Regions:
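Periplasmic/cell-envelope proteins involved in peptidoglycan metabolism and beta-lactam response
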Residues: 1-391, 415, 490-497, 616-617, ...
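Extracytoplasmic
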Residues: 76-79, 86, 93-97, 176, ...
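Soluble non-cytosolic domains of exported or imported proteins
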Residues: 78, 125-133, 183-187, 247-251, ...
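Beta-lactam-recognizing serine transpeptidase/beta-lactamase-like catalytic domain environment
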Residues: 92, 98, 273-287, 332-421, ...
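Sec-exported extracytoplasmic/periplasmic mature domains
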Residues: 139-148, 198, 244, 262, ...
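Acidic/histidine-enriched alpha-helical segments
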Residues: 150-170, 320-333, 443-445, 510-513, ...
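Ligand-recognition elements built from short beta-strands and adjacent flexible loops
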Residues: 578, 618, 632, 662-831
């Protein structure tokens, strides 16, 4: 074997002498380098993958997150539109209110604090004196009404004690950062509380240098919100509806026109700091709110007030069990001038039913099946007593029923049998179809058989031979059954459908019932036709009746009723105007003229017929009464069917402009159920006030300068007394202090019976035992005759103008300041 060269020997020698640890270190360095390369590559991959996910795959999402953290997006609340009556009087508006709240955890002045030097723990103990002082001052301001009249607050009242305790308890919660002290606070009170808090903090500010705990501060703040206000309270409530706590329309016009009234909220987008607060930034982006539009109604507050007043009186006087309704509408355009359902509610506090609770409780218990208030077993069967009678639930919560009932607009949500009012429609069918004329005579023998049924007129009276006008005045069931037979089932149904009874009226209000109760053409047999002809076989809504009667007298046109007349912007500019919407012509003009004639014959001059009690001297009025049995309801305790008394009138009868309708659901008058006695006077009373107000054409008779002898009304029920005055052309006023209770009779009147007074004089009626009320005569000298008349009327006095009516008052027959009886005639001499 050849030996290595010297050079190779040297290399071999060196290799053999290498340190084993050095060889390991080399290998480790190689491995570490490789691992580092792998780690760097992997990390780079992870970073690249993350960047891909963040920047590309989920870039939009993360950019959105970043924007949310960096930007503050604030809502600009749109102002809800207002609701006005036809003359611009505000019925619903929105006001700024404030929620007053406190941060007790930051209100160090209300607590005594101590710090444990070892643990650093701070213990807070309520300071009763401070809490009492602050709670008292805040409560006084909350109840002052204006933030200033603190001395006027009765600190001994229950209201004060309740509010004080609520504030005290809220401020006592030392660990809470948010406690509500009051809601719906007006701006004056809010400013007063802010001023008090600022002054308090300034006066009590100090620091505990030793403990390092700041003392002497209370933290009270406010949050802006909006409140819906209804200045007239329980007035046209079923029409207006109300808004919920969040400001959304829940019922009535507030609901049906929600999108119109609400407007569109705006936004402000700006940068915010680390604490989430907005940074002043000239580059902030603002999207202005679009305020809601206003509704201008066809409703007239003066007509609505008259309708509600007389409806309330009638409900009380006749012990009406299931509420009442009234409608005044323009027969040519469908514009609703008044719509009332009573009792109703105050939309400012729609959840409250306490004012009507007793009435509502009786109503619910009168229809236990309808409201499901019987006790039930676990299997769903009813609990019964030993006699097998169902047992009422003594602990039932009926509040939901109470609210639902008082919220309902009775004119569109509830069905009833119209009874004899429907005879107007049957007459229109007969005349238009050529099956009858005004002079068509038919015989009423007192009983009439159809199949196996025998029909009678009221009181089983035989009216004998009569024409159409006489039959309507006599409200003869047998005449109209025979007329229905002449018309026939098929044609009768076609007219019934054309008059709108098989569909909604289309009124611009929510919750109009979609449930119609009538016989289809195929099921309208001879008995069903007979009952339908006089209004006892179909259930309809009051508004359906009004639109159908309007069509019968306005030339034959079925119009869509509406409450909203126009929509305006916040500056009053008209955005949309609602005109008459004629759906179709149902009968001819000539047939409509005939219906107007027979309806006027029903009322005549107030001396004959069931409609005479709706007569008002000086006006041509057509009308029809209807006393119907409610076959779809539980019977009364005496076994008789519950009744509805209704009356509809149109005027002037020769060319009607308005319709007035009143219905009383289940009246319990001790003397009668007849609508001619119960409902007709209510309609007449409404007409007596609104006809002059609307300028309705009179009958053309010049009564200026004529006098009327005042009738003796003492001993008459007040409603009958009013009828007597309407017929004679005298106005009437029920004394304010007198409640129109059932059976109330007139105990005093002024002017007295037998007095000769000018046509149109107001007679004051009293139903208590106090003989006469006095009033102070105002000084009207120097005033115009019209203004003087208004001043005297406001004082409860009648007026006679002597001399030049265009001049100023020179003398007055009763001295200014004198105390005289209300109703006294004061002669003013003008020149």
């Amino acid at each position: 074997m050849q030996e290595p060269s010297p050079k190779n020997k040297k290399g071999l020698y060196r290799l053999r002498r290498a340190d084993p640890h050095e060889r390991l270190s080399v290998r480790l360095r190689h491995f570490s380098f490789g691992a580092a390369v792998v780690f760097v590559v992997a990390a780079a991959g992870i970073v690249i993958h993350s960047l891909y996910n963040i920047q590309i795959k989920n870039g939009a999402t993360f950019r959105q997150y970043a924007a949310q953290q960096q930007l503050l997006d604030s809502t600009i609340q749109a102002t809800r539109g207002e609701i006005y009556d036809t003359s611009g009087i505000t019925l619903a508006s929105t006001s700024v209110v404030w929620t007053i709240w406190a941060d007790p955890s930051y209100s160090t002045a209300l607590f005594t604090s101590s710090k444990n030097d070892d643990t650093g723990e701070v213990t807070r103990t309520a300071d009763p004196a401070a809490l009492q002082e602050v709670s008292t001052q805040i409560t006084l301001r909350l109840l002052s009404g204006d933030g200033e009249s603190l001395d006027s607050v009765d600190t001994s009242s229950a209201a004060y004690q309740t509010q004080y305790q609520a504030v005290y308890d809220a401020l006592s919660k030392s660990d809470s950062a948010y406690q509500t002290l009051a809601t719906k606070v007006n701006n004056a009170i809010k400013l007063s509380i802010e001023q008090y808090v600022t002054a308090y903090n300034k006066a009590h500010k100090k620091a505990d240098a030793d403990k390092g705990i700041r003392k002497g501060r209370i933290s009270v703040s406010s949050t802006k919100s909006f409140q819906r206000d209804y200045p007239y309270g329980a007035f046209a409530a079923a029409v207006l509806g109300f808004c919920d706590a969040d400001g959304y329309g829940t019922y009535g016009l507030e609901k049906s026109y929600e999108s119109t009234l609400a407007g569109v909220n705006g936004r402000t987008i700006t940068l915010r700091n680390a604490y989430g607060n907005a940074i002043a930034d000239e580059n902030a982006t603002t999207y202005a709110a679009k305020d809601g539009s206003n509704l201008v109604l066809s409703l007239d507050v003066n007509i609505q007030e008259v309708a509600e007043r007389y409806l309330n009186e009638a409900i009380s006087a006749n012990n009406v069990e299931n509420r009442g309704a009234a409608i005044v509408m323009n027969v040519k355009t469908g514009a609703i001038l008044a719509m009332a359902s009573k009792p109703d509610f105050d939309p400012n506090n729609a959840l409250d039913y306490t004012a009507n609770e007793a009435y509502l409780n009786e109503l619910v218990h009168a229809e236990p099946e309808l409201y499901g208030i019987y006790l039930k077993n676990e299997d769903g069967s009813y609990v019964t007593d030993t006699n097998g009678n169902k047992v009422l639930d003594p602990e039932g919560d009926y509040s939901g029923y109470y609210r639902d009932i008082q919220w309902k607009n009775k004119t569109i949500t509830e069905l009833y049998y119209p009874g004899s009012v429907f005879k107007v429609i049957t007459a229109a069918m007969g005349v238009d179809s050529g099956k009858a004329t005004i002079n068509t005579t038919l015989n009423c023998s007192g009983a009439y058989g159809v199949a196996k049924e025998t029909y009678h007129c009221a009181g089983k009276k035989a009216h004998g031979v009569q024409n159409l006008a006489e039959a309507l005045r006599n409200s003869c069931n047998i005449y109209f059954i025979q007329l229905g037979q002449r018309i026939g089932s098929s044609l009768f149904y076609d007219y019934f459908d054309a008059f709108g009874f098989t569909e909604r009226t289309g009124v611009d209000l929510p919750s109009e019932t979609n449930f119609m109760q009538y016989y289809s053409k195929s099921r309208l047999g001879e008995v069903e036709l007979a009952s339908s002809a006089f209004g006892q076989a179909m259930a309809v809504t009051p508004l359906q009746v009004c639109t159908a009667i309007s069509a019968a007298v306005n030339g034959g046109y079925l119009v869509t009723p509406h409450v909203v007349d126009k929509i305006t912007d916040q500056n009053g500019n008209v955005i949309e105007e609602v005109g008459a919407n004629v759906r179709r012509q149902v009968i001819s003009e000539s047939a409509s003229k005939a219906i107007r004639q027979i309806m006027e014959y029903e009322v005549a001059d107030g001396t004959q017929g069931g409609g005479g009690r709706a007569y008002v001297a000086g006006y041509r009025i057509g009308g029809k009464s209807g006393t119907s049995e409610q076959l779809n309801m539980d019977r009364r305790s005496d076994g008789d069917y519950k009744k509805v008394a209704s009356f509809v009138a149109v005027l002037p009868a020769d060319d009607p402009e308005i319709l007035v309708y009143v219905m009383l659901d289940d009246p319990n008058n001790a003397k009668t159920d007849y609508s001619s006695i119960l409902a007709a006077p209510v309609v007449g009373n409404i007409i007596s006030e609104i006809a002059p107000y609307l300028g309705i054409a009179t009958d053309g008779t010049d009564r200026s300068g004529t006098t009327v002898k005042v009738p003796n009304l003492i001993g008459n029920e007040w409603s009958n007394a009013q009828v007597s005055l309407n017929i004679k052309g005298l106005k009437h006023q029920l004394a304010e202090s007198d409640a129109s209770q059932a059976g109330a009779v007139v105990t005093y009147q002024y002017p007295r019976a037998g007095a000769e007074v000018p046509y149109g004089t107001t007679v004051y009626l009293y139903t208590d035992t106090y003989e006469g009320r006095h009033t102070e005569v105002p000084d009207v000298t120097g005033k115009s005759a019209d203004f003087a008349r208004q001043m005297l009327a406001a004082a409860g006095l009648n007026c006679i103008v002597a001399g030049d009516a265009n001049g100023l008052v020179q003398e007055q027959s009763e001295a200014a300041g004198a105390s005289v009886q209300r109703g006294t005639l004061v002669t003013i001499t003008c020149g």
